[in-house]
């Protein structure tokens, strides 16, 4: 039997824990006769399971003949990609849209005003015809960034909604990237789009998963689950290593730390500002009380609150206990102590 866990980002593993509540909210809304929202933004720290969550949504609708699911890349021409994919899918499913198109992405990607207008017109024409055939189109865009392709697509999507096309959109990415996109003056309508912050996985659910896969005691499964802190990538790493070696937890820690550092923590740390790092560093030394953190860094309550909110939204710290901040990522303090130099 193959290892049911994976170390590959974005790959849906055999053994994974569904976020039924959060994903279900999107599906429930989209399935309404008159949906209250047609756009959702999914935010989460690196390794939080954004891509797998999008795959769950895509799988749900791909099995429904009424829906057409398009998974698009944020770093390519989204309008051209949508035209190409919708044309291909329509031909594959023998949907006669009355279109005389023989265009590939390369032909549609010339960045000239007339070509852009033509692509947008073609896409609206396709959506109109799909609407008349009772079809719905779900656009899924992962790793969202604030670039020209995304801005043009988002602007057009607003038009699709006002023209009552049966279109739906789920975009996922890091919190900062989503915020940057929403702050665009021409895209203020995105502020009304609900944001779903991917929460840590349930420790009991992780415990149950480990017990179902491995022949281990309840106490060992709980110990493993608690080590992950509900971080999906850590859940996969620990399960993968346990499957490969069947060593006890203590022997797995060095490789567990190494995988977290290489594939997640180095990048997460590099994206923190100077004050972000100082706050996280102080917390990593065992100072959890917000008053003590402020005292250590000589900063005002207002400033700490601003950074506290941002670090929580990024999924780096946990502020669920009033007056305290702790690290949300498993063994992040070990990484900071060993590899990160911070001057207070």
Indicate where each model-derived feature is located:
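Conserved small helical "lid"/interfacial subdomain of P-loop NTPases
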Residues: 193-221, 227
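Short regulatory helix/loop adjacent to the ATP-binding pocket of P-loop NTPases
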Residues: 176-193
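Conserved Walker B catalytic segment
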Residues: 113-176, 184
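Amphipathic alpha-helical "lid/sensor" segments that cap RecA-like P-loop NTPase cores
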Residues: 214-264
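Conserved NTP-binding/hydrolysis module of P-loop NTPases
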Residues: 77-106
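C-terminal leucine-rich, beta-strand-based interaction scaffolds used for sensing/assembly
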Residues: 2-3, 262-344
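A short, basic N-terminal segment
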Residues: 1-40, 331-334, 342-344
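Walker A/P-loop nucleotide-binding motif
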Residues: 35-56
């Amino acid at each position: 039997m193959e290892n049911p866990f994976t170390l590959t980002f974005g790959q849906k593993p055999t053994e994974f824990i569904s976020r039924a509540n959060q994903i279900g909210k999107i599906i429930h809304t989209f399935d309404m006769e008159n949906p209250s929202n047609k756009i959702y933004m999914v935010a989460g720290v690196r390794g939080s399971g954004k891509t797998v969550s999008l795959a769950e949504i895509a799988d749900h609708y791909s099995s429904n003949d009424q829906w057409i699911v398009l998974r698009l890349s944020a770093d390519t021409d989204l309008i051209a990609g949508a035209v190409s994919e919708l044309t291909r899918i329509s031909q594959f499913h023998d949907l006669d849209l009355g279109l005389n198109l023989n265009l590939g992405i390369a032909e549609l990607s010339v960045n000239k005003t007339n070509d852009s207008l033509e692509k947008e017109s073609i896409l609206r024409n396709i959506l109109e015809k799909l609407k008349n055939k009772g079809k719905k189109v779900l656009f899924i865009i992962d790793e969202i960034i604030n670039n020209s392709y995304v801005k043009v697509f988002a602007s057009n999507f607003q038009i699709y909604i006002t023209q009552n096309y049966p279109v739906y959109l789920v975009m996922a990415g890091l919190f900062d990237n989503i915020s940057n996109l929403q702050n665009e003056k021409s895209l203020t309508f995105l502020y009304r789009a609900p944001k779903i912050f991917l929460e840590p996985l349930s420790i009991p659910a992780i415990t149950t998963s480990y017990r179902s896969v491995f022949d281990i005691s309840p106490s060992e499964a709980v110990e493993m689950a608690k080590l992950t802190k509900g971080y999906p990538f850590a859940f996969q790493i620990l399960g993968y290593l346990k499957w490969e070696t069947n060593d006890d937890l203590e022997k797995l820690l060095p490789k567990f730390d190494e995988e977290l550092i290489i594939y997640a923590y180095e990048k997460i740390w590099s994206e923190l500002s100077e004050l972000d790092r100082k706050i996280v560093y102080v917390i990593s030394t065992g100072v959890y009380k917000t008053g003590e953190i402020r005292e250590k860094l000589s900063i005002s309550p207002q400033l700490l609150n601003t950074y506290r909110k941002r670090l929580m939204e990024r999924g780096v710290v946990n502020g669920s206990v009033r007056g305290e901040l702790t690290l949300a990522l498993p063994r992040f303090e070990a990484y900071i102590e060993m590899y990160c130099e911070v001057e207070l």
